[in-house]
Regions:
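RNA pseudouridine synthases
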Residues: 1-239
Length: 239
């Protein structure tokens, strides 16, 4: 099992992706010789949207992959996200519940019309606002947990609520014209920053954390943010 961090910039043509790099690393480990068996096994337990950064979980064998996938399905694999929202939500903490359906390569909220679509699925998330700034337009830093794993869920639900994620050109173009006057940011301001799981072999509880690298997070007081996350305190306002 490996918990790995993805750089906020997606791999482009000719650039190695994280899966290829991990397989290359595993192939070079002592005793990794696999005569006649091809490349090392690497199971992807869960994925992130291409423009999103953060922690990923991989399994080095099928048994571990099955155990970790079971944790994910049962909600025992706990993930937290940081998201930068365009605007200030009225409630500093709350839940968003919507019905989503996939149309091609995008997800669409059909809340209130879900009975019209057989493929509409419920999507639920919980958020807590950690900090609010003006840079130069109103931006809010949210800590997000999801109760379901729908396609583009966090991005679509916040956009549907009127607070699209900074940098999300797919779901928040109108808000981005104000929030990104000179294309100051690139990539979606969303990071899977915290991950907790039970090791599939040892049974040990494990936790991992990363600090976002996307410059969209640079305007927030990250040291203060760490304290807020650890101590469960209130909202910090700056600017």
């Amino acid at each position: 099992m490996s918990a790995n961090r993805r750089d906020w910039q997606s791999a482009g043509i000719g650039q190695p992706d994280v899966v290829s790099e991990l397989k290359s690393y595993l192939a070079k480990l002592p005793g990794a010789g696999r005569p006649g068996k091809g490349e090392p096994y690497l199971g992807i337990v869960h994925r992130l949207d291409q423009p999103v950064e953060g922690l990923l979980v991989f399994a080095k064998d099928k048994k571990a992959a099955a155990a970790l996938s079971k944790q994910l399905a049962e909600g025992a694999l706990n993930k937290h996200y940081y998201a930068v929202l365009c605007g200030y939500p009225d409630c500093p903490e709350g839940d968003l519940v919507d019905y989503l359906r996939k149309e091609g390569n995008v997800a669409v909220a059909v809340t209130g019309r879900e009975q019209e679509f057989a493929d509409a699925k419920i999507a639920a998330l919980h958020y807590r606002i950690l900090e609010e700034i003006n840079d130069p337009s109103p931006l809010a830093l949210a800590d997000v947990t999801i109760g379901t794993g729908r396609f583009h869920q966090i991005r679509v639900q916040f956009a549907h609520a009127g607070f699209p994620l900074l940098g999300d050109t797919k779901y928040g173009m109108a808000a981005l014209k104000e929030a990104m006057p000179a294309q100051k940011y690139r990539g979606v301001a969303l990071c899977a920053y915290s991950l907790e799981l039970v090791h599939p072999i040892s049974g040990k509880k494990m936790g991992f954390r990363v600090v976002p690298k996307n410059p969209a997070f640079a305007g927030f007081a990250m040291e203060e943010l760490k304290k807020l996350t650890e101590n469960e305190t209130g909202i910090s306002k700056r600017g």
